[in-house]
């Protein structure tokens, strides 16, 4: 079981780095340490649409739930009614990511999962007269984390959907909100209560034993001037409340959770700006060249990824990335996933190499219904060479 990430240099060749198992090893129930082959680097996948459904990822599953045509979980629950929605989402939670998926991840050398969740998993935080979210998700999160812990995977739980929505018009917040309503004291307080509750669950429930990191909000607005209160109030209070919850349980400092924030490169300002204590702080960066200011050519993408340094707050995990390219070219002959597999393999290797200059990477996402491996690790291309960290894959 791991809670601690610490300084390390010998294996990586970097001046400083950190390894999940320096102080506490993660092992599966049969004693396997998945981090040995990766020299301690995080190599993982996101479990997109498991607990925060993004309809674009899996339109068929969304439609089968009775949610077709709805933009978000909030909208679907409003349409179906609470009881019918609870039944539909329970069926989804029990089938989208299974124990077989966890075993498949391990078989291909992955060692980490990032689990997006919404604040509504703590059901007493939901305003019953105005908010509509599925109920009953916690037991499915417990089961998932138990499977992953038994398999030896490291687990990051990510507050993907914040109260009021941290960004507008995006289903990854759980609601298709017209404005970003998160950046207010009363919404911060709801998120802080979620973090306290989640922290307590993690430390008291053995099923969560491999959860070592809690991300306090995913992808806030990329405008530092608009989210100053997040840096001055929410981030420092998140540290205080999480640590207070741990202290109330008499958790040893070595067993504290890492507290993760988006890094400075994300564009929401320096997360450390108002922090007085960064003990066990960690950082997240998301790197999608699809939307970056990069020339749209294969040479440019390879060159950019090979030279990516992503030097910002440390330690940083590249917590989301993909192989997708701009919408206007993604299906033409020069970029088609079927006829350009050699390029995508090289680009995958270039990105992996760059992100392992930091602490590692988590691909978005494990599973999709797009018929496009550029968004789905399980989709096939990325699994053609078991042991993703071997030299054949990482050498261009």
Curated annotation (Swiss-Prot):
Record bears the keyword Signal: yes
Coiled coil regions, renumbered to chain: none
Glycan-modified residues: 30, 272
One BP annotation, GO: glucan catabolic process
Keywords linked to the UniProt accession: Carbohydrate metabolism, Cell wall biogenesis/degradation, Glycoprotein, Glycosidase, Hydrolase, Polysaccharide degradation, Secreted, Signal
Catalytic activity: Random hydrolysis of (1->6)-linkages in (1->6)-beta-D-glucans
Principal location listed in the UniProt entry: secreted
One MF annotation (Gene Ontology) recorded for this entry: glucan endo-1,6-beta-glucosidase activity
Signal sequence range: 1-17
Cellular component GO terms, alphabetical: cell surface; extracellular region
EC number(s) given by UniProt: 3.2.1.75
Domain of life, source organism: Eukaryota
Similarity-based family: Belongs to the glycosyl hydrolase 5 (cellulase A) family.
Protein name: Probable glucan endo-1,6-beta-glucosidase B
């Amino acid at each position: 079981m791991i809670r601690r990430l610490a300084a390390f240099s010998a294996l990586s060749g970097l001046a400083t780095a950190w390894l999940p198992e320096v102080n506490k090893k993660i092992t599966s129930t049969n004693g396997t340490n998945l981090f040995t082959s990766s020299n301690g680097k995080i190599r993982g996948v996101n479990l997109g649409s498991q607990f925060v459904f993004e309809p674009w990822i899996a339109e068929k599953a969304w439609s089968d739930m009775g949610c077709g045509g709805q933009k978000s979980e909030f909208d679907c629950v409003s349409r179906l009614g609470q009881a019918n929605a609870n039944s539909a989402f329970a069926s989804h939670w029990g089938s989208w990511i299974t124990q077989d998926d966890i075993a498949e991840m391990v078989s291909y050398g992955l060692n980490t999962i990032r689990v997006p969740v919404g604040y509504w998993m703590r059901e007493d935080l939901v305003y019953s007269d105005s908010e509509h979210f599925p109920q009953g998700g916690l037991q499915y999160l417990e089961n998932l984390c138990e499977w992953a812990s038994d398999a030896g995977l490291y687990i990051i739980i990510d507050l993907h959907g914040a109260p009021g929505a941290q960004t507008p018009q995006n289903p990854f917040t759980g609601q298709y909100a017209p404005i970003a309503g998160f950046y207010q004291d009363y919404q911060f307080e709801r998120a802080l209560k979620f973090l306290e509750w989640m922290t307590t669950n993690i430390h008291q429930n053995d099923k969560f034993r491999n959860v070592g990191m809690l991300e306090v909000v995913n992808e806030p607005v990329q405008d530092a001037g608009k989210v100053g209160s997040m840096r001055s109030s929410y981030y420092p209070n998140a540290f205080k409340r999480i640590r207070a919850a741990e202290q109330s349980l008499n958790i040893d400092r070595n067993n504290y959770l890492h507290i993760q924030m988006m890094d400075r490169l994300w564009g929401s300002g320096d997360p450390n700006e108002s922090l007085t204590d960064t003990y066990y702080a960690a950082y997240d960066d998301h790197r999608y060249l699809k939307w970056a200011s990069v020339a749209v050519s294969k040479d440019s993408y390879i060159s950019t990824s090979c030279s990516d340094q992503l030097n910002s707050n440390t330690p940083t995990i590249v917590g989301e990335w993909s192989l997708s390219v701009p919408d206007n070219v993604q299906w033409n002959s020069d970029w088609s996933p079927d006829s350009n597999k050699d390029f995508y393999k090289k680009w995958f290797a270039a990105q992996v190499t760059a992100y392992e200059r930091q602490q590692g990477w988590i691909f978005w996402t494990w599973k999709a219904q797009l018929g496009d491996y550029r968004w789905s690790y399980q989709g096939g291309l990325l699994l053609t060479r078991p042991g993703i960290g071997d030299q054949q894959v990482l050498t261009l």
